[in-house]
Amino acid sequence: MAKIAVVTGAGSGIGRASALALLNSGYKVALAGRRKDALDETAKMAGNNTPNAMAVPTDVTKRDDIVALFAKVKATWGRLDLVFNNAGGGAPPVPLEELPYETWLSVVAANLTGPFLCTQEAMKIMKDQSPRGGRIINNGSISAHAPRPFSVAYTSTKHAITGLTKSTSLDGRQYDIACGQIDIGNAVTPMTERMTKGVLQPNGTTMAEPRMDVKAVADAIVYMDSLPLDANVQFMTVMATKMPFVGRG
């Protein structure tokens, strides 16, 4: 029987690559994201596996959208085995004291509240289905460990994702729900294109940074969910080998 997955932010980048890897591994995947055209494009890219993809336009900053997403998955496929909480975003790099309050709220809504709400809805399904349980994987980012300059909103939410991961792991145990976190550094996506031109470093200089093939991340997601539910990759870091992470800050 095919596993059922939800991938948020599936219209581009890491979400698209991960959704395609899951589809190619035999999953049925609900593609969640704000742009239906992008989700449809992801589904088309799956080739022969396109029938196993379901595009569900979803804004993770809107609770009603999230509730509707998981209700549709349950109504369509009857169960849920995997959620990849991937959708999110950042803010323009500005000094902490100049960050607009509204920008702070928007980043928190996308990067923390959205994954929390997705986790809530997923757990409601996973705890009551038969066979019971499932897996939730959170996209934490390298910024869950070390900040970039002028990134207080993004860095704070990614550190908070680690708390969400740990709490979900603890609270999900009794229901056979495993939760892990993948911390990604400099995968080739539209979001990291700016790194090829140079990004601000902690010492005030600007430097281009190496990136890695996003397929490495997608393959890691498939591996994390290949384990039985009595085993869990609690935390995994997948990063460009030569990126300035170790020693950053």
Q: Where are the regions a protein language model picked out?
A:
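C-terminal helical subdomain
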Residues: Q181-I182, L200-V246
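Conserved glycine-rich cofactor-binding loop
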Residues: G11-G13
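Active-site-adjacent segment of SDR/Rossmann-fold oxidoreductases
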Residues: S130, A146, S167-I177
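Substrate-binding pocket helix/loop in short-chain dehydrogenase/reductase
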Residues: V94-L96, T103-L105
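The beta1-alpha1 cofactor-binding region of Rossmann-like NAD(H)/NADP(H)-dependent oxidoreductases
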Residues: P57-L69, Y101
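Active-site helix of classical SDR
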Residues: T119, T157
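Residue(s) in the substrate-gating loop at a strand-loop-helix junction
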Residues: S141
